[in-house]
Amino acid sequence: MDKIPVETLIKDLNLEVIVEAKNNKIDITTSDVNRPGLQFSGFYEHFAYERVQIIGKVETTFIEQLPDDVLAERADRFFNYPIPCLIVTRDLNIRQEIIDAAQKHDRYLLRTKEASTKFINRLINYLDEKLAPQITIHGDLVDVYGIGVLLLGESGIGKSETALELIKRGHRLVADDAVEISKISEDKLQGSSPEIIRHFIEIRGIGILDIKTLYGVGSVRNSMNIDLVIQLEEWDEDKYYDRLGLEDDYIKFLDVKVPKLTIPVRPGRNLAIIVEVAAMNHRQKQMGYNAAHELNKKLLKQIGN
């Protein structure tokens, strides 16, 4: 999503509407915020008006000391800029001059009971998630031992069946068939399911299953960071498959690299157990231990002797 209507922000963060913008609504396009203390003192160089504006206790204390005519002039100048909204924290009093200026320029004036720091943190996290670059891919996403495992492969390769077996073994489904991937930071991806198919899984020969109803709320989750990608493919006798794990492979989504494993599929292989072990091995690597490297060191040491 590249922009958020202020109405959505009001609903999701439970904000009180003091003045509603009716004909001059401006969407939010950045997760950055601005505290306009300098603007109410008359300084407008480098004013980031495109951001959500937030006034807390410090700014309110300064504003309370301004004469009525001075505040009216400064509020009029402030709301003349195309700001998405002004939010007052701590349920603080809002002077009439600010309300009048917001009404005159048809800008949103909002209020929250939360303290400034707590609210700003919540707001930035919310905006980062909503405004994150996003793509949708075909696959399954499962929480395996706290590792977000994205299963990829051709249709019919067994992604959904593997996910179902993992759920039966106590792991949690995030998404089946369609995975929405969001870039939540420079090096992190988060996956989720489209709302309409959330918690559902399709198994050929059976149909649609409601995992939340069948296995309980502990078998699903709404979103998960993507830590590991497992590509399932038909076993190819002529293709070389890594048997040691000394070399790392990666795949890119939204310019973020994610570790990738390619698992060949053939009758008799228990894919769910392989995925479990892959997730545990990935966690072990995150903790600084690589079994393949340790074995390689031992072999080199033995050869050296």
UniProtKB/Swiss-Prot annotation:
Chemical reaction(s) catalysed: [HPr protein]-L-serine + ATP = [HPr protein]-O-phospho-L-serine + ADP + H(+); [HPr protein]-O-phospho-L-serine + phosphate + H(+) = [HPr protein]-L-serine + diphosphate
A GO BP entry: regulation of carbohydrate metabolic process
Class of this enzyme: transferase
Classification via CDD domains: HprK_C
Required cofactor names: Mg(2+)
Catalytic residue positions: 138, 159, 177 (proton acceptor), 243
InterPro entries: HPr(Ser)_kin/Pase, Hpr_kin/Pase_C, Hpr_kin/Pase_Hpr_N, P-loop_NTPase, Ser_kin/Pase_Hpr-like_N_sf
Important for the catalytic mechanism of dephosphorylation as annotated region, ranges: 264-269
UniProt xrefs under SUPFAM superfamilies: HprK N-terminal domain-like, PEP carboxykinase-like
Domain of life of the organism encoding this protein: Bacteria
Binding positions (ATP): 153-160
One Gene Ontology molecular-function label: magnesium ion binding
Gene3D superfamilies: HprK N-terminal domain-like, P-loop containing nucleotide triphosphate hydrolases
Record keywords: ATP-binding, Carbohydrate metabolism, Kinase, Magnesium, Metal-binding, Multifunctional enzyme, Nucleotide-binding, Serine/threonine-protein kinase, Transferase
Region of interest (Important for the catalytic mechanism of both phosphorylation and dephosphorylation), residue spans: 201-210
Positions bound to Mg(2+): 160, 202
Documented EC number(s): 2.7.11.-, 2.7.4.-
Function: Catalyzes the ATP- as well as the pyrophosphate-dependent phosphorylation of a specific serine residue in HPr, a phosphocarrier protein of the phosphoenolpyruvate-dependent sugar phosphotransferase system (PTS). HprK/P also catalyzes the pyrophosphate-producing, inorganic phosphate-dependent dephosphorylation (phosphorolysis) of seryl-phosphorylated HPr (P-Ser-HPr).
Miscellaneous information on this protein: Both phosphorylation and phosphorolysis are carried out by the same active site and suggest a common mechanism for both reactions.
Domain notes: The Walker A ATP-binding motif also binds Pi and PPi.
Assembly notes: Homohexamer.
The family this protein is said to belong to: Belongs to the HPrK/P family.
Entry-linked PANTHER family: HPR KINASE_PHOSPHORYLASE, PROTEIN YJDM-RELATED
Name of the protein described by the UniProt record: HPr kinase/phosphorylase
Organism: Thermoanaerobacter pseudethanolicus (strain ATCC 33223 / 39E)
Phylogenetic classification of the source organism: Bacteria, Bacillati, Bacillota, Clostridia, Thermoanaerobacterales
